[in-house]
Structure formats: C-alpha cells, structure tokens
C-alpha cells in the first residue's frame, strides 16, 4: 500500500512554517492518540502516520530530501538531523507518551474548586475540604503484591517501555508484557487487586491568602493522587471561585460600586455615606453633580495578594428618579418644571441642549 503525502497527512500546504507543522501535528496526535482511542486500530495507525510525517517534515534536511524525491528519499536510509523532541511539544499532556524513564512518573494531579464570598477572598480564610482521590493501599504498602514480592519485567528490564524499530524510525511504547509498570506481580493484593492504590477521601485544611481573585489557583504539592507502584503522588490545585457581591464589583485590586442619590442631592450637593470593606466612608458630592460621575476613594480597594499594594474604590453616582410621589410632591415638581420653560432651560440642562442641537443638525442634513 502506497504512503500518503506527508503534507496531506498533517493537513498543511507545502509552504507550511515550522510553527504550522507543530500545531498541525499536535492536533493530529491529540485526536488519534491511543490513550484517547483504546483498542481502535485505525486511530493507532493514523497516529503513527502523523508521527512519521512530522518527524520528516520538522527536520530541515529530511524535509528538503522529501520535497525533492518524495518517499523514495528514505527507502535506503536518511541522514540524521535535528529531529524535534516530542516531549518538548507535548510536555505532560499525555504523561510523556513518547518516552522517558519509568522513575520519572508520578501520580495524577487533582483539581478542586472552592467558592468564597468577596469578603473571604479579600481577608483570607482557612477552609476544610474533602476530596476523592487514590491513596496508597495500606494492605500491600503500595507494592500491589499480597506477599510483597514483585519481579522485574524481563521484557523491558524494569523500564516499563520497549523500543520498536519501524524502518528508519525508532519508537518507544508501553511494554505489552507488564503494562508499563516495569514489574510482574504473580500474587496480586486482595484489597487493591494489584493496583497498589485504593479509592478514598482525603480531608485537608487549605489556607487561602488574602487578596485572591476569581480563577486564582493554590498548589498543594504532593496532595494529589498517589502514583502507581510507589512513585510520588501528584499535586492538588485548589481553584478559587468568588461569588457575585450585591454591592461591589471587582476589577483586579480595584472595587466599583454604584451610589444612588436623589435629584435634590445631586443638584444642591450633599455628603453621602458609602460602604467600604472596612466600614463606612463619606463622599462630598458637589452641587450640579451628574449621573455617572465617579468618585475615587484611594486605598479602599483590595490588598494585592502578590505585591501587597492596595487598590482603590470607585463610586459611580446614579441619580434616581423619584417614584411613588404624593399629590403634593407631584404638584411641586410640576411647578419646578415650569421654571425651565423658554430659552433659559438650555443653561440648566446643557446635555439636553447639546443633544437637541445634534438631532436638529442631523435632520437638517437629511432633508437638505
């Protein structure tokens, strides 16, 4: 069966850059990787095809040979080049699927989300959390063996991986004899069935520092899942989710809030009290204050969890229209409104005057 064109395999043009090749290979490998498609022979074949195509096209010398001679360039061998390290591309996405020593493995990382009120996030808090996880089997002490005896795998010699030669390419894959463990267990533990780990719940006390924000993560080293065969456990990542607050909205270390005032307060000026994180504060509103005016209270925001500097509190004035008026109040407002009649009204409502002038100018242009 003839091989497909390497560029076609990765879905890129022949002018593709090194970065384009890397992105295309990453998409292809993640789609067809055997760990995501267990038992799917077609996916495994597609994965190998993608890997072979990338190893050639990502190497400058090999790509030049391929562009000139096609697949025939490699029928009798090919010179060595700077073939990219697959581990550099994927890191830990598939747990070093392309190689690496068995001793470098560790347990899986665990994620946990904790919800806080804004006040808790600002001040810091200590929380007790309970997480489902895999822990070391106490019956076999993590060995997976009922009698504690394990044999080094003779196929991979304890590495958990075997080297496969496919033409000019050498690949590492999980040892089929020991399943990647590097050891053979003849008498599996009756409690964990040879896994060396059992499901359990772990209770931890997590100290959340003052100033954390929505999406911040706290890493607890070694508190993740216990690794197989006694290898170190992974880490626990506690992600912070801050609930919406009825008064404040947070923007980094700054806080924002709306301060409702009456029309009379905005027109005549007044002193209003506003809530802050550490009590009340006063804002002096000058006469003729418009809705939307911002007042800044320095240092009344959130103390940064990283720099220990404090943000500010921004208070936005909202001039409220009075509701549920009495007959007397309505009469007074009607009398007040009459005082704005005529040309003098423009000087009392500059924004309205500007708006009306703009509307008139617009219609004049439309009808001219």
Curated annotation (Swiss-Prot):
<feature type="repeat" description="CXXCXGXG motif">
    <location>
        <begin position="175"/>
        <end position="182"/>
    </location>
</feature>
<dbReference type="GO" id="GO:0051085">
    <property type="term" value="P:chaperone cofactor-dependent protein refolding"/>
</dbReference>
<comment type="similarity">
    <text>Belongs to the DnaJ family.</text>
</comment>
<feature type="binding site">
    <location>
        <position position="189"/>
    </location>
    <ligand>
        <name>Zn(2+) 1</name>
    </ligand>
</feature>
<keyword id="KW-0346">Stress response</keyword>
<comment type="function">
    <text>Participates actively in the response to hyperosmotic and heat shock by preventing the aggregation of stress-denatured proteins and by disaggregating proteins, also in an autonomous, DnaK-independent fashion. Unfolded proteins bind initially to DnaJ; upon interaction with the DnaJ-bound protein, DnaK hydrolyzes its bound ATP, resulting in the formation of a stable complex. GrpE releases ADP from DnaK; ATP binding to DnaK triggers the release of the substrate protein, thus completing the reaction cycle.</text>
</comment>
<dbReference type="GO" id="GO:0005524">
    <property type="term" value="F:ATP binding"/>
</dbReference>
<feature type="repeat" description="CXXCXGXG motif">
    <location>
        <begin position="137"/>
        <end position="144"/>
    </location>
</feature>
<feature type="binding site">
    <location>
        <position position="178"/>
    </location>
    <ligand>
        <name>Zn(2+) 2</name>
    </ligand>
</feature>
<dbReference type="GO" id="GO:0009408">
    <property type="term" value="P:response to heat"/>
</dbReference>
<keyword id="KW-0863">Zinc-finger</keyword>
<feature type="binding site">
    <location>
        <position position="192"/>
    </location>
    <ligand>
        <name>Zn(2+) 1</name>
    </ligand>
</feature>
<dbReference type="Pfam" id="PF01556">
    <property type="entry name" value="DnaJ_C"/>
</dbReference>
<keyword id="KW-0143">Chaperone</keyword>
<feature type="repeat" description="CXXCXGXG motif">
    <location>
        <begin position="189"/>
        <end position="196"/>
    </location>
</feature>
<dbReference type="InterPro" id="IPR036410">
    <property type="entry name" value="HSP_DnaJ_Cys-rich_dom_sf"/>
</dbReference>
<feature type="binding site">
    <location>
        <position position="140"/>
    </location>
    <ligand>
        <name>Zn(2+) 1</name>
    </ligand>
</feature>
<protein>
    <recommendedName>
        <fullName>Chaperone protein DnaJ</fullName>
    </recommendedName>
</protein>
<comment type="subunit">
    <text>Homodimer.</text>
</comment>
<dbReference type="InterPro" id="IPR036869">
    <property type="entry name" value="J_dom_sf"/>
</dbReference>
<dbReference type="Pfam" id="PF00226">
    <property type="entry name" value="DnaJ"/>
</dbReference>
<dbReference type="GO" id="GO:0008270">
    <property type="term" value="F:zinc ion binding"/>
</dbReference>
<feature type="repeat" description="CXXCXGXG motif">
    <location>
        <begin position="153"/>
        <end position="160"/>
    </location>
</feature>
<feature type="binding site">
    <location>
        <position position="175"/>
    </location>
    <ligand>
        <name>Zn(2+) 2</name>
    </ligand>
</feature>
<dbReference type="InterPro" id="IPR008971">
    <property type="entry name" value="HSP40/DnaJ_pept-bd"/>
</dbReference>
<dbReference type="GO" id="GO:0031072">
    <property type="term" value="F:heat shock protein binding"/>
</dbReference>
<keyword id="KW-0479">Metal-binding</keyword>
<feature type="domain" description="J">
    <location>
        <begin position="5"/>
        <end position="70"/>
    </location>
</feature>
<dbReference type="GO" id="GO:0005737">
    <property type="term" value="C:cytoplasm"/>
</dbReference>
<dbReference type="GO" id="GO:0006260">
    <property type="term" value="P:DNA replication"/>
</dbReference>
<keyword id="KW-0235">DNA replication</keyword>
<feature type="binding site">
    <location>
        <position position="156"/>
    </location>
    <ligand>
        <name>Zn(2+) 2</name>
    </ligand>
</feature>
<feature type="zinc finger region" description="CR-type">
    <location>
        <begin position="124"/>
        <end position="201"/>
    </location>
</feature>
<dbReference type="InterPro" id="IPR001305">
    <property type="entry name" value="HSP_DnaJ_Cys-rich_dom"/>
</dbReference>
<keyword id="KW-0963">Cytoplasm</keyword>
<dbReference type="GO" id="GO:0042026">
    <property type="term" value="P:protein refolding"/>
</dbReference>
<keyword id="KW-0862">Zinc</keyword>
<feature type="binding site">
    <location>
        <position position="153"/>
    </location>
    <ligand>
        <name>Zn(2+) 2</name>
    </ligand>
</feature>
<feature type="binding site">
    <location>
        <position position="137"/>
    </location>
    <ligand>
        <name>Zn(2+) 1</name>
    </ligand>
</feature>
<keyword id="KW-0677">Repeat</keyword>
<dbReference type="Pfam" id="PF00684">
    <property type="entry name" value="DnaJ_CXXCXGXG"/>
</dbReference>
<dbReference type="GO" id="GO:0051082">
    <property type="term" value="F:unfolded protein binding"/>
</dbReference>
